[in-house]
From Swiss-Prot:
It comes from Lactococcus lactis subsp. lactis (strain IL1403) (Streptococcus lactis). The gene is celB. It comes from the Bacteria. It is a multi-pass membrane protein. Induction: Induced by growth on cellobiose. Negativelly controlled by the CcpA regulator. The lineage of its organism: Bacteria, Bacillati, Bacillota, Bacilli, Lactobacillales. The chain crosses the membrane at residues 32-52, 92-112, 119-139, 188-208, 227-247, 274-294, 355-375, 406-426, 463-483. This is PTS system cellobiose-specific EIIC component.
C-alpha cells in the first residue's frame, strides 16, 4: 500500500494539482456552478409539472390497473392542470422552463465567456457577450432550409410569399433567421466550449496586448471600459466568423452540427458505458485521498459530458413525464442511435452519482459517520463523527475527510474507493434493467440522501428502495475498517 501511495504521490498528485489550478478548467467549472440558479429553476418547473399532471394519473393507474387505465378517454384521466391556481402555476412553470432549460445553451455561453475572460483578467462582461455572439454566429438558419426547399421558380416564389404572409402575423419573415431549439439547449455545450473559448481567448489576448481604443479620462468609466473592448471584440468575432464561413463552404454543414456529430456524440456514447462511469468514480476517490477535491478537479468531465445529458433528460421529462420516460426505456431508446421520434433517455447523468453513490459526499461518508458512532472506540473519531453528522446529512463531508482524517489514511482509502464503485454498479444495473427510473431532474447537491434520489428520478418510489439498499451496503463496507481502526494507536493513523 505504501508503494502504491508513493507512486501516486509522485506521478498522479502533481497532474491532479495542475488540473485543479489550470485557469481554463477552473473557468469551465465556475461556469457550470454559475448556471445553477437557472438549472434549478428549470428543475423546479419540471417538478411542478410532474405534480400537476403526472402524479394524479399515476395514482389513477395504480388504482385501476394498466389495462383499464389505457382504455380511458383523455378527459377521464386525472389531472390538476384544469384546477384554478394550480393550473395557472403549471402554465407559469412552462414559461420558466422556456426561459431556462430550453435556452440553457445560451446561458452557458454567457457564463463560459464571462468566467474565461475573468480568468484572463479582462472585461468579463464583454467576454460573456463575445461567447454568446460566437454561438449565435455559427447557428445554421433553419428558415433558409424552408425557402430553399420551396425553390426559386414561379410556384416557389408564390409559396414563399404565402409563407411570409403566415409568418408576418407572428412578427417573423422568411428572410429572418430561425434557430433550432436543439442548438440553444444543452446540445450547444461542446460548440460553446470550443468556439467560445477560441473567441474569448482571442479577445483576451488583444485586450492584454493593449490593442484597444483609449478614451480621455473625462469619459465615464463604464463608457471607457466598453470602448476598450470594441477592437478585440470585433477581431474575435470576425475570426470565428471566417472559420464558420470556410468550414461551411468546405463541408456544406455548420460547425455546431460537425462538433456535435464528431466530438460530442462519441464522448456521450462512451459516457453511458459502465466502465467509463466506474473510472470517473474511482478517480474522484483517488483525488480526495490526496486532499484534492475530486468532483472539482473532474468538473470539466463530470459537468462537461454528463451534465448536458442530465439537462437532456430534464427537458424530456418536462415533456413526457415519468411514464413517457419508462416507455422510451422499455422500447430501447437509451441512445441517439435508437431514438424514437428524436427522443431518447440517458441512463447515467451527472446527478446519478449524487442520488445513488455519494451519500453524505464522496465515498458515501455519511455511512462512515454512522459506523463510527456505533462501532468506534476511539474518542477522537467519535468527536469528529458527531461533529460531521449534521453536515454529512447535507452532503458536506470535509469535516470528516480532514478531521479523522480520511485523506491519506491507508485503512480508510479502501472503503472510500470501493463503496461508491459498488453503489454505482448496483444503481447502473437497476436503471438499465428498468428497475428504477433514471435521474431526470436536477436536485441541489445539499439535498439529503434518499430524498435526493426520490426527487431526482421524478419521484420514483423505487429510487428510495435502491438508495436504502446502497446505503446499507455502503455501511457494511465501512464497518470492518472502522473496527480495524480501533486496534491502531492514534499516532499510527496520523
Amino acid at each position: 500500500m505504501n508503494g502504491i501511495t508513493a507512486w501516486m504521490e509522485k506521478y498522479l498528485v502533481p497532474v491532479a494539482a495542475k488540473i485543479g489550478s489550470q485557469k481554463h478548467l477552473v473557468a469551465l467549472r465556475d461556469s457550470f456552478i454559475g448556471m445553477l440558479p437557472a438549472t434549478l429553476a428549470g428543475a423546479l418547473a419540471a417538478m411542478i409539472s410532474a405534480i400537476v399532471t403526472t402524479f394524479p394519473s399515476a395514482i389513477q393507474q395504480m388504482m385501476l390497473g394498466a389495462t383499464a387505465f389505457s382504455k380511458l378517454a383523455p378527459e377521464k384521466v386525472w389531472t390538476l392542470a384544469n384546477t384554478p391556481i394550480i393550473g395557472d402555476l403549471n402554465n407559469i412553470s412552462a414559461l420558466v422552463n422556456q426561459g431556462t432549460l430550453t435556452v440553457i445553451g445560451l446561458i452557458f455561453a454567457f457564463s463560459w465567456g464571462y468566467n474565461l475572460a475573468r480568468a484572463y483578467g479582462v472585461n468579463d462582461l464583454a467576454g460573456g457577450i463575445v461567447s454568446l455572439a460566437t454561438l449565435f454566429a455559427g447557428l445554421p438558419n433553419q428558415m433558409g432550409k424552408f425557402t430553399a426547399a420551396l425553390g426559386t421558380g414561379k410556384a416557389g416564389v408564390a409559396a414563399t410569399d404565402k409563407l411570409n404572409g403566415v409568418l408576418g402575423d407572428q412578427g417573423l419573415a422568411a428572410w429572418k433567421p430561425l434557430f433550432a431549439s436543439a442548438h440553444l439547449d444543452a446540445g450547444a455545450y461542446f460548440t460553446v466550449i470550443i468556439m467560445g473559448a477560441l473567441a474569448v481567448i482571442i479577445y483576451a489576448k488583444l485586450m492584454l496586448a493593449d490593442i484597444t481604443i483609449k478614451m480621455p479620462e473625462s469619459v465615464p468609466p463604464a463608457v471607457a471600459k466598453a470602448f476598450l473592448a470594441i477592437i478585440p471584440t470585433i477581431a474575435a468575432l470576425y475570426i470565428v466568423g471566417l472559420i464558420y464561413y470556410i468550414i461551411g463552404k468546405l463541408t456544406n454543414d455548420s460547425v455546431i452540427n460537425l462538433i456535435t456529430h464528431y466530438i460530442a456524440e462519441p464522448f456521450q456514447i462512451l459516457s453511458q458505458n459502465i466502465f467509463s462511469v466506474l473510472i470517473v468514480t474511482l478517480f474522484v476517490s483517488v483525488f480526495w485521498f490526496f486532499g484534492l477535491h475530486g468532483p472539482n478537479v473532474l468538473a470539466p468531465v463530470l459537468d462537461g459530458i454528463w451534465g448536458p445529458l442530465g439537462l437532456n433528460n430534464q427537458a424530456l421529462y418536462f415533456q413526457v413525464h415519468s411514464q413517457g420516460i419508462r416507455d422510451l426505456i422499455a422500447k430501447g431508446a437509451v441512445d441517439k442511435a435508437h431514438a424514437i421520434n428524436g427522443d431518447y433517455v440517458n441512463l447515467w447523468v451527472r446527478g446519478s452519482w449524487d442520488a445513488f453513490a455519494w451519500f453524505g459526499g464522496s465515498g458515501g461518508t455519511i455511512t462512515l459517520v454512522i459506523a463510527i458512532i456505533l462501532f468506534s472506540k476511539r474518542k477522537d473519531y467519535k468527536i469528529v463523527g458527531r461533529l460531521g453528522l449534521a453536515p454529512g446529512i447535507f452532503n458536506i463531508n470535509e469535516p470528516v475527510l480532514f478531521g479523522l482524517p480520511v485523506v491519506l489514511n491507508a485503512i480508510f482509502f479502501i472503503p472510500f474507493a470501493v463503496a461508491p464503485l459498488i453503489s454505482v454498479i448496483i444503481a447502473y444495473t437497476a436503471t438499465a434493467l428498468h428497475l428504477v427510473d433514471p435521474v431526470v431532474n436536477a436536485v441541489p447537491w445539499v439535498t439529503p440522501p434518499i430524498m435526493n434520489a426520490f426527487m431526482a428520478t421524478g419521484f420514483d418510489w423505487r429510487a428510495i428502495v435502491l438508495t436504502i439498499i446502497n446505503l446499507i451496503i455502503t455501511f457494511v463496507i465501512w464497518v470492518p475498517f472502522v473496527i480495524a481502526a480501533n486496534k491502531l494507536e492514534e499516532t499510527e493513523l496520523d
